[in-house]
């Protein structure tokens, strides 16, 4: 069977050259006579893999020296707990900006550890926009402020990162890390599950300023303490070695594409193809505030559930798969991460045009 265009929100499409290299090296990595999946994480071979992955991420994101890159497990969802356990150490209070389902889940976990202040929310607008933050991030006595830079389910993103001068800014970048340029120095902590733009499921990346490490409560479990990973080069226990290896290959691929600035321009072009059609369409609509449209996750719908289902079925027959929207939003959603080629988006738009002509 030919490969399809996979618009899944995660686990998501990986670059074909990466998959082909994985296939080539699967049973015999670098002449070792064994697979990465069989290799000791204490071996020099794996040490070079994790070091290269860290160095590539530092290079691609221009990460300052005062930050650690940590390779973790448990997904972004475990970070919802790790963050307050490690950072709620002075005021026992944190600020959260609610912009979607995932930011709400992050807040709910933080409430189990300390006090949470909702700084701003777009929930009344059904998370179709990003709330204004002007003047809301002042001299509050907070241990950190948490945002979600891209809302995978709702299809919104921050256009400008809020300025927080006296409080560490924590960002969930799971669905748009490496898709556009960010100034890492504006953040105290960035985290992301790998399964959208970095690699396969099983790996979580954390980029954390070192002065935020070491403040966890003494009751914090060892495996939930950032210091454990920082002191042990993310090798305190067996890491998700295969996921780290594939992520390294994805980072190499991204560098070959010209880095983050080049992929950002391509992502803008891909998303514009779809948004331009949606803006002109008489059948399909997008629920998102145009100012805050995501480059990565694009929800859209037709006037009826019957048409939505027909669209999805015929799309699948054309090799355009995993377009069903999240159950909380409905309709369709096209996730067009870094690895999605321009021709994949163009084929989707071409099909949408044909479907509209058939259903005038």
Curated annotation (Swiss-Prot):
PANTHER family xrefs: PHOSPHOSERINE AMINOTRANSFERASE
Name of the protein in its database record: Phosphoserine aminotransferase
Keyword annotations of the record: Amino-acid biosynthesis, Aminotransferase, Cytoplasm, Pyridoxal phosphate, Serine biosynthesis, Transferase
EC number(s) recorded for this UniProt protein: 2.6.1.52
Main location: cytoplasm
Cofactor note: Binds 1 pyridoxal phosphate per subunit.
Residues reported to bind L-glutamate: 42
InterPro entries: Aminotrans_V_dom, Aminotrans_V_PyrdxlP_BS, Pser_aminoTfrase, PyrdxlP-dep_Trfase, PyrdxlP-dep_Trfase_major, PyrdxlP-dep_Trfase_small
Subunit annotation: Homodimer.
Binding site for pyridoxal 5'-phosphate: 76-77, 102, 152, 172, 195, 237-238
Homology family: Belongs to the class-V pyridoxal-phosphate-dependent aminotransferase family. SerC subfamily.
Pathway(s) of this molecule: Amino-acid biosynthesis; L-serine biosynthesis; L-serine from 3-phospho-D-glycerate: step 2/3
Domain of life: Bacteria
Subcellular location: Cytoplasm
CC terms in the record's Gene Ontology section: cytoplasm
Cofactor(s), by name: pyridoxal 5'-phosphate
GO BP of this protein: L-serine biosynthetic process
Substrates-to-products reaction catalysed: O-phospho-L-serine + 2-oxoglutarate = 3-phosphooxypyruvate + L-glutamate; 4-(phosphooxy)-L-threonine + 2-oxoglutarate = (R)-3-hydroxy-2-oxo-4-phosphooxybutanoate + L-glutamate
SUPFAM superfamilies, per database record: PLP-dependent transferases
Residue(s) carrying N6-(pyridoxal phosphate)lysine: 196
GO molecular function list: O-phospho-L-serine:2-oxoglutarate aminotransferase activity; pyridoxal phosphate binding
Record Gene3D superfamilies: Aspartate Aminotransferase, domain 1, Type I PLP-dependent aspartate aminotransferase-like (Major domain)
Organism: Bacillus cereus (strain ZK / E33L)
Function description: Catalyzes the reversible conversion of 3-phosphohydroxypyruvate to phosphoserine and of 3-hydroxy-2-oxo-4-phosphonooxybutanoate to phosphohydroxythreonine.
């Amino acid at each position: 069977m030919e490969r399809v265009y996979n618009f899944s929100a995660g686990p998501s499409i990986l670059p074909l050259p990466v998959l082909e290299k994985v296939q080539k090296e699967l049973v015999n990595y670098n002449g070792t006579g064994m697979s990465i999946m069989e290799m000791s994480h204490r071996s020099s071979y794996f040490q070079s893999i994790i070091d290269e992955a860290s160095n590539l991420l530092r290079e691609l994101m221009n990460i300052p020296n005062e930050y650690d890159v940590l390779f973790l497990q448990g997904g972004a969802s475990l970070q919802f707990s790790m963050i307050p356990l490690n950072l709620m150490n002075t005021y026992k209070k944190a600020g959260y900006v609610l912009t979607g389902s995932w930011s709400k889940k992050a807040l709910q976990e933080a409430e189990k550890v300390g006090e949470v202040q909702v700084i701003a929310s777009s929930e009344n607008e059904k998370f179709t926009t990003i709330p204004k933050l002007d003047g809301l991030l002042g001299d509050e006595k907070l241990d950190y402020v948490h945002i979600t830079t891209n809302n995978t389910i709702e299809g919104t993103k921050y256009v400008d990162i809020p300025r927080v001068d006296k409080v560490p800014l924590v960002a969930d970048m799971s669905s748009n890390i490496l898709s556009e340029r960010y100034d890492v120095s504006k953040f105290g902590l960035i985290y992301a599950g790998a399964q959208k733009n970095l690699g396969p499921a099983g790996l979580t990346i954390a980029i954390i300023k070192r002065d935020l490490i070491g403040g966890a409560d003494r009751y914090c479990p060892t495996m939930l303490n950032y210091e454990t990973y920082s002191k042990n080069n993310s090798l305190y226990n067996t890491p998700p070695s295969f996921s780290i290896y594939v992520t390294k290959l994805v980072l190499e691929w991204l560098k070959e594409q010209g880095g983050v600035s080049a992929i950002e321009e391509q992502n803008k072009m891909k998303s514009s193809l779809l948004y331009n059609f949606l803006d002109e369409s008489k059948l399909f609509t997008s629920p998102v505030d145009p100012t805050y449209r995501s480059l990565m996750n694009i929800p859209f719908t037709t006037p009826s559930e019957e048409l939505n289902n027909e669209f999805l079925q015929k799309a699948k027959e054309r090799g355009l798969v995993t377009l069903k929207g999240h159950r909380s939003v409905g309709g369709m959603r096209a996730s067009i991460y870094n690895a999605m080629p321009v021709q994949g988006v163009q084929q989707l738009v071409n099909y949408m045009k044909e479907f509209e002509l058939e259903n005038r």
